[in-house]
Amino acid sequence: MYNTINKNPILHNFSRLTQDSAVAKFKKEDKIKFEISKAEINCKLSNKKPDFTKMVAGSQQSVLTREALKKRKQKPVRELLKEISQLIQTLKPCFLMSPLSVSTYLDYDTCKFDAVIFDEASQIFPQDAIGSIARAEQVIVVGDSKQMPPSNFFMADFDDENEDDSLDFESILDSCQAIMEQKWLKWHYRSKSEELIAFSNANFYHNNLITFPSAKSESEDFGVHFYYVKDAIFDRKAKNNRKEAERVVDLVWEHFEQYPERSLGVVSFSVAQQALIEEIISERRKQNDIFAELFDSKREEPFFVKNLETVQGDERDTIIFSVGYGRDSAGKFYHLFGPLSKSGGERRLNVAITRAKYNVKVVASIKSHDIDLSKTTAVGTKLLKEYLECAEKGMEYLKRTITFNDSEPDSEFEIEVGDVLKNAGYNFDIQVGCSGYKIDIGVKHPKNSDYVLAIECDGATYHSSKTARERDRLRQEVLEKLGWKFYRIWSTSWFLNKKNEQEKLLQAVEKAIQEYDNNIDDDFIYKKNEEKESFIDEEI
C-alpha cells in the first residue's frame, strides 16, 4: 500500500485540506449554477413579454385588456384563448391543466406546445390523453405502474361480495411503456424513515428504490405502528366498523394534541368506512371544536379523510390507516376486502401505505394471522396479511425480510476505522440503511440508539455514484435533512497520517455527541417555554 502511494505523485501529495476544500467549492458552485440557470430562464421569458403601454387596436394585447376591464358579458374562455393564443403562451409559457381541461378550453389549431408532460399517468385513460398529445411536439409520460390504474370504481355500485364490479383499465402509461424509451426515477425522498418505504420497496419495486436512513432511532412518532381494536364488529349491511372508526378518531385527537405542527391524513379501505369516520369527527367537533384551526381546509397540508381510490397524489406527515373489515356480529370473517381483493388491488395497498413522511398508524380489528391465504388467491390480500405482520412486529419483521445495518464492511480500511471506534468504547453500526446507498459507519449516542455521526470512508458507495453532484452534494444534503452529521475520512490521508487521522476521528465523534446533547437541551428549553406561553394564553 505504502509503495503504491509513494510511486504515485497524486497520492503521495494528497492533502485532506485541499480535497475537502475542492469538494466544498464544487458544492457551492454547483448550487450557484442552478440559481444562474433559473435566472437565465426568467430573463429570457421576461424579455419576450410585450409592452402593454404601446398597444395597437385589434392586437391580441388590446383584446386581452378589453376583456379584463369588462364587468359582464366576457367572452367564453375557449373563444378568448383562441383569439389571443400567441399572447397567452408568451405571458404564460407553461400551462397546468387536466387532460379534460385541455380539450375543453384550448383550440386545437391555435394552441400548440413544444412538450406535454403527464403526471400520475397511471390514472389517465388513453382516450383522455389524446387531445393533449395532439397539441404537442414532444410527450413525456410520468407515472408508476405499481400504483392506481384508471378505474370505474365511482361509476359502479361496488359490492364487497362481488369483486368484479370495479374494473381497472389500461392507462396512457401502460400504452406508452411498450413504445417509448423508459427512465427510472429511483431516489425516494418522502419518507423520513426507511421503515415506511421498505415494505413497498421489497414487494413492489424489487428493492430498486434508493432510500435514505434516518439518524433517529425507532420511536412512536416514526415508522409503522399497529393499533388493534379488540371485539370490533364489521357491519355487513352498512359495510363499516364503528368501533374501529371511533379508535381512528381517538388517534386523530391524540395526534393534534401531541403533534399539532404535523400534517395528518386518514385513509380507509372503503367509502363506507370513510363516511363513518367523517361522521364521527363531525359529531365530536360539535361537542368540542378545540382543534378547529387544525381542521382548517386552508392549511398548507390540510387534514383529510380519504379511501384507497382517492388518496393517490396526497402525502402527509402522519397517515392513519383504517382496515375496517373484520368479523361480523356472528363472528364470521369473510376474506373480502373490497377493491383490494380483486385483480390489481395490490396497487391500491401500495398507494395507501406510502403516503406518510414520518409515520403510519395501522388500525385494524383483525391481525395478520386471521387472514387465511388458503381462502383467497388475491395478491392484494396476501400483501395485506404481510403488511399487517410488518405493522405488528416492526423492525423484527423487516430485519427478517430485508437487510438492515448488517452488511459486511466495504473494505479493510472501513474495518480499521471501526476498530479505532470500538477500542475507544463507541457503539456503531456498519453499512447503515437497507437500500443501495448505505452510510459506511453510523456512530450511536452512548445513552440511546440515535446516530450522532455518519462516517464516510470513500469506499464502494462513494465511488459507485455516477456523477460528482450525486456523490458529493445531493446524497449528503438528503441525509442531512434526516438528521445526519457527516465526517469524511479520505483513505489516502488515513494511510499517510494514520495517527493524526485517528485523533481527528475521535475528536469529531466527541464533538458530535456534545452537539447532540446541546440540541436536546435546547429542545427541552424551547418546549418548556412553549408550555409556559400556552398557559399564559389560557389564563388571558
Model-inferred region functions:
Residues 74-205:
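ASCE P-loop NTPase helicase motor core
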Residues 111-117, 314-326, 334, 361:
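A short beta-strand element within the Helicase C-terminal
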Residues 438, 442-477, 492-496:
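Short beta-strand-loop-alpha-helix junction that forms the active-site gateway
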